[in-house]
Design a protein with these regions (language model features):
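Secondary-structure end/capping motifs
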Residues: 70-165
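A short, structure-level motif marking secondary-structure boundaries and short turns
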Residues: 2-4, 20-23, 140-143
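Pocket-lining segment of extracytoplasmic ligand-binding domains
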Residues: 17-113
Length: 190
């Protein structure tokens, strides 16, 4: 929503390079799978969105540095609004059924390396999450409920310690999530 490809300079970095690049403020954001996501969060990256929020059953996450969020709140809100629009459109296509739903099933199937039936099951189990879901107290993906994403961040911290990706669990896991105000700002983007 209001974001063009030219607004973002995308580069490919291997996870072992991205974590130090984050720590040196050489990159503003990164898309990665866990356990690297846990390492980035432990380095001070803010969790912006998990791939599961868009219907992908993985632990991949979108992150942005605190500095980027502070310096570019409008860009961050537009990015999140764009992800929200994609989720909303996917949900609408699934609800409409027919050819519209088949496009979503095909995309999810291709992204996950599964057939159409498996893609349908994945989407049934985890429909694309919208900002309304993320701001709801009732959603397991809630940014505002202690049983939502915060519980997942705590769990990922434990997993990362067990995998020896980080030395200790985050002291303040809530600080690893994007602030509620960012999600609310994204809802206002037209």
């Amino acid at each position: 929503v209001g974001m063009k490809p030219s607004d973002v300079n995308m580069i490919v970095l291997a996870p072992p390079v991205a974590v130090p690049a984050y720590q040196r403020n050489q990159i503003d954001g990164y898309y990665v799978w866990d356990v690297w996501g846990a390492r980035l969060e432990a380095s001070g990256a803010k969790l912006v969105q998990r791939a599961v929020d868009d219907g992908f059953p993985s632990s991949s996450i979108w992150t942005m540095t605190k500095e980027f969020l502070a310096a570019n709140p409008d860009a961050a809100a537009r990015f999140i609004a764009t992800l929200n629009q994609a989720s909303t459109e996917m949900r609408a296509s699934l609800a409409k059924g027919g050819a519209d739903a088949e496009v979503v099933y095909a995309a999810i199937g291709k992204a996950n390396g599964v057939d159409r039936a498996a893609a349908a099951e994945l989407l049934k189990a985890q429909p694309p999450a919208t900002l309304q879901n993320l701001l709801s107290n009732d959603s397991p993906l809630s940014f505002v409920s202690k049983t939502g994403l915060l519980a997942q961040v705590i769990q990922q911290g434990r997993i990362a310690v067990q995998a020896e990706a980080i030395k200790q669990e985050p002291a303040n896991p809530q600080d690893l999530l994007a602030p509620r105000s960012l999600l609310e700002a994204a809802m206002k983007v037209k």
